[in-house]
């Protein structure tokens, strides 16, 4: 018998103490997750919740992951929110990865309003370049063009834009918003720093 088999056998003991049964169920939830048997992981975590008088961050997190791995994102969302809220209640500090996972679910569910609020929170808390660029993407998904350009401009001003496509996009977008000088300056900087390829098309854009 492997570890899973031993724990499953343990659960068949009728006189098993409640605390031992709870530990066994939680362990099975984790072991089945390690085996990528997501349905059995969920089954044991849910059985734990039915018996336990309190909730647990490991169980909430495990349930969310298991549903996520099965592409059941709507089911994964509330368990992750519960995990984050309970962690904060217990005085635990949440990392950027915790917020990024939640934002990933919002994006998959196309819940861009919540993604926008969360992305702003992440920028304030972590000031990570990925979040600055995500802000631009969220505004684009919401068809808020002026805000999208403003977000891209803020990312540029914070020094997190280093690819040709975004340099050109920002420069042309600002020019289209009747801010041609700034747009031209950004494209010229991209050419000077070799971020934008010095070809005929890009030189024509710079000259406009």
Which functions belong to the PLM regions below?
Residues 1-208:
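Alpha-solenoid helical repeat scaffolds
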